[in-house]
Amino acid sequence: MTLIDQLPPDADPDALFEAFSSWAEGQGITLYPAQEEALIEVVSGANVILSTPTGSGKSLVAAGAHFTALANDQVTFYTAPIKALVSEKFFDLCKLFGTENVGMLTGDASVNADAPVICCTAEVLASIALRDGKHADIGQVVMDEFHFYAEPDRGWAWQIPLLELPQAQFILMSATLGDVSMFEKDLTRRTGRETSVVRSATRPVPLSYEYVTTPITETLTELLETRQAPVYIVHFTQAQAVERAQSLMSINMCSREEKDKIAELIGNFRFTTKFGQNLSRYVRHGIGVHHAGMLPKYRRLVEKLAQAGLLKVICGTDTLGVGVNVPIRTVLFTALTKYDGNRVRTLRAREFHQIAGRAGRAGFDTAGFVVAQAPEHVIENEKALAKAGDDPKKRRKVVRKKAPEGFVAWSDTTFEKLIGSEPEPLTSRFRVTNIMLLSVIARPGNAFEAMRRLLEDNHEPRKAQLRHIRRAIAIYRSLLDGGVVEQLDKPDAEGRTIRLTVDLQQDFALNQPLSTFALAAFDLLDPESPSYALDMVSVVESTLDDPRQILAAMQNKARGEAVGQMKADGIEYEERMERLQDISYPKPLEELLWHAYNVYKKSHPWVGDHPVSPKSVIRDMYERALTFTEFTSWYELARTEGIVLRYLASAYKALDHTIPDDLKTEDLQDLIAWLGEMVRQVDSSLLDEWEQLANPEIETAEQAQEKADQVKPVTANARAFRVLVRNAMFRRVELAALDHVRELGELDAESGWDEDAWGEAMDKYWDEYEDLGTGPDARGPKLLLIEEDPEHGLWRVRQIFADPNGDHDWGISAEVDLAASDEEGRAVLRVTSVGQL
């Protein structure tokens, strides 16, 4: 029986409250006072701003709100900041209200979009609000994690629905809202409903606070001995979190029995990357690492071990994700300052409370603990003074260590101030874009009036409003000049005085805003060109969001190689530094793509919000014939391999969906298959999540996660595996062409081909030829011979060298071990010979 079966015959507020609270009681849930107050206001039709601590049951209030909307025959929207949380909430609400009554919109996928309960990201709701405004069929909006309203890049999406949906009842929820008086008055004015602010400083699990001047290992040992684990140690960079985990390996965290339980739960889990091998050591010792740069499967494993109570310590960052379910008894701050991208500053009250609030698990703990470490130099000084004892002479002789130059200090006073401070008021992040104007113009009615109201009656200060008005006028003029909008002599049947001359693709700005540009750019490429497949990849890559960490690493690598070459050429330092400014990461087809984009933008001005960005991540990986591990090692990205994987998965989805089937040549199909299989073998969860969002009726989120841990054999995808084999062989050709015999030896020492063996073989080749080709023809299928021998579980392969004379009598022979390849998720081969046929 679902919650929808509990709906009373009529929507009387008292009957609704009684029905929902009776259902909760039947589930063994006793409502907290704040929950009761919020639900009474919701069923009465008021807007509710719910500001209660973490673990105080805001999700139950949200369920009660949806229940109320359904009773009133209204469409109710639930919004969350990330797609994973939207997906999780979708399945939760399906259990409560039945799958036929719940839908999901994420920009990537649309499921049961006409359902009365819709889960979506804030951007999706903002898009609907801009397009339909007061005519949207939305009776209620539940906005979770509302503090995202103040996010610099995304906060606009939390504001737009408040401005444009006056017909809706709003329930705004967060643990760290601060002063909300502006929202209270503004919502009441816009919606005509009363707005109730429900606050509670009382946590289900009370927190105690302590500031310590002991070294962190001593602090941690005491926390473990006093049963205050699990401890979440807060760091402010991913590197610090990993370094801390390594430094704690000397502390004995777990008993033998506990380590056996950890090993049992890990089971056959594959730690496939360099970081993964280190993580395996940490978690088996009872230490977790958790940050956004990790592969999703590693984060999920850490969460699984933590939920089972097997991890004593988790080393993570201050960005402990929204919706991440990691049980924590103690939060240990290593510092009370952070670098925010511009400067080092003291934590804001909201940042502090957002992390500190994770301590103490409702239903498990009777208390939570928040501990802050003093700065290291203060700790060392305290230690030296303690060693001197009470002897005044010895204490005077103690040489106090000074803080590092430029150090931003904190103290117990800082800690106490943060504890006692309310979160800062939320700052408006309103912005004007092409898509905003186009959406408003597409609406029925007077677009000028609607836009004027949006620009002058938002949450921005007047000075900022004037800036937005100037921006809107400039965009409107560009739309007129481009012929995208036209002014009408008299209003049309729907009251428009201006109208679009093009069809506005629904949701085009939410997922791949430049996908239509890519379709147009494909026509500029020559299908007969040897580089056609890679050029198609470059077009698609130019439409994707920039993975900043990857591109920075690629630029550093390019500059490092350039410096080495310039030094060898005897170029002076000043000139070297000047030349370095012109060196960036690879940008294939840059001139062609920018010219095409500027032409396309004239007739499709909304793409002006999303400039084209040429880059070469997939292409570089393919041209260098690198595996995922080799790529992250080559560019020193092991600590951010999760970001690399997310980009690869996004690129695979874009290639697969954006390129029409009739443009997918054999080479391009091979490349797409290779990329998809590589992503799946490293960590299939991102692709599984995507497929599951598109087909949620097939499996639940939990089943999708289990599936992600059960990797399919890499040899099962024959097309992709052939490309993996081809790349593995061609990687050796590229290294041989550069005469990098040391690296070849590192690859093949186990099969008897060490540096000396490779050097001897290649010396004979260089005696005969001056060059070894590595162009498109050199890596083509004609120069790779494959003999499949499934009976013996192997393939025999021969990579023929592209010598300058075209003799094609030299090459590399190898055997591919199919079972070992399935075990490791890559092409495992053993070189058998290098030389002439």
Positions of predicted regions on the chain:
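Helicase-associated low-complexity/disordered flanking segments
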Residues: 1-40, 44-48, 256-284
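Conserved C-terminal RecA-like helicase domain
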Residues: 79, 87, 94-103, 238-313, ...
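Conserved two-lobed SF2 helicase motor
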Residues: 114-129, 285-296, 306-325
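Conserved interdomain hinge at the start of the Helicase C-terminal
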Residues: 212-236, 243, 300-308
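Compact beta-sheet-dominated globular domain cores
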Residues: 802-837
